[in-house]
Structures are given as C-alpha cells and as structure tokens.
C-alpha cells in the first residue's frame, strides 16, 4: 500500500533504525519512545490490525519478538508487548504493529 507509512519503511522508501529483520518481519526503534527501549515489530504483509492477521502471520511476529528479546537482554528483567487496535484502542498507524517496551521498570496500566 503506497500510502501506508510502514509499507513504505518495508520498501526502503523511508529510513528506519532497524533492529531485526527476516523474510517476514521487520523490527525497528520507535521514533517517539515511551520507555528506555521501545521497538516496533511489523509483518511485511500488510494488514490493518491484529484481527486481520492469520495464525501464520501472528506466529511470525511473536517468533521474531521472542528471538529479539532473548538475544538483546530484555528477557531477564522483563518487557511488555502491546498492539493497539483501531481508534478507541489508540491505533494511529493502520498497519498491524506490536510495541516492545523494556529496559526499565514499566508503569502498571492505569497508573
């Protein structure tokens, strides 16, 4: 989708600070971090939100997040994975993406 920000990042039209890439998934640093370490993981196949993804795409994403967090010292102290869905869920970019936050003590939801 030519008007999709994340599709343009995947295509190399917009630069990103890549931290992970395989055949199906791209991970990069969030431009506006909400934690000491804040990354976005996206599937290279466009979908609007998590409800449009099939089980293979979900497995691809979570396998990538698992590999990344295990290899980058996030697993031991903990991290959070979040996906916002649609307007009321806080989604602002309509290409399914998962936020991976860590590197510090995170606040509890609702705090």
Task: Name the predicted role of every residue range.
Residues 1-111:
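HIT superfamily nucleotide-processing domains
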């Amino acid at each position: 989708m030519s008007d999709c920000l994340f599709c343009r990042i995947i295509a190399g039209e917009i630069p990103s600070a890549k931290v992970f890439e395989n055949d199906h998934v791209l991970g990069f640093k969030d431009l506006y971090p909400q934690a000491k370490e804040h990354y976005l993981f996206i599937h290279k196949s466009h979908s609007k939100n998590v409800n449009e993804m099939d089980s293979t795409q979900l497995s691809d994403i979570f396998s990538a997040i698992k590999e990344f967090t295990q290899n980058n010292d996030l697993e031991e102290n903990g991290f959070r994975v979040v996906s916002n869905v649609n307007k009321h869920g806080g989604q602002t970019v309509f290409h399914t993406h998962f936020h991976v936050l860590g590197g510090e003590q995170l606040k509890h939801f609702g705090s």
